Amino acid sequence: MEYQGQTGHATTDKVEEYGQPVAGHGGATGGPTGTHGAAAAAAGTGQLQPTRDDHKTDGVLRRSGSSSSSSSEDDGVGGRRKKGMKEKIKEKLPGGAHKDAAGQQHTPAAGEYAGTGTHGAEATGEKKGVMDKIKEKLPGGQH
């Protein structure tokens, strides 16, 4: 098998960069046949120069590090309204008050309990790990 850009071999069959036979004349002493780009320029010099498409990602899709939330929310009347900067920041903060179906923040009425979900972590002075928090939320009691 003769590679593109190689000269001086006994065979006169030319093949392209993918190994397919190339029809043409020129043999070992002629110019390049069936080549293009940088490989065609290098073929006359006897150097093997692979051609490849210039892609920065090499076929891998990458995501940016930024995260964003929706810039609008349901206004409760069937339409949508733009969120303000304050609402966007509140939405990203952990442990905020949950919204009900109408999109309004729920504040506890008299007699309702608005706990933070930490059961006695302040009393012992130890912080819960991520796994402990997940286990606490799983149904079926304490694990």
From Swiss-Prot:
Skewed-composition ranges (Gly residues): 24-34
Keywords in alphabetical order: Stress response
Biased composition (Polar residues): 1-10
Region annotation Disordered: where it falls in the sequence: 1-143
Cellular component annotations (GO), alphabetically ordered: cytosol
Protein name per the record: Dehydrin DHN2
Recorded family membership: Belongs to the plant dehydrin family.
Tree of life domain: Eukaryota
Alphabetical list of InterPro entries matching this protein: Dehydrin, Dehydrin_CS
Record-linked Pfam families: Dehydrin
GO BP, one annotated term: response to abscisic acid
Entry's induction text: By abscisic acid (ABA) and water stress.
Keyword Acyltransferase appears in the UniProt entry: no
Basic and acidic residues: compositionally biased ranges: 51-61, 86-101, 124-143
Record organism: Hordeum vulgare
Feature: compositional bias, Low complexity: 35-46, 62-71, 109-123
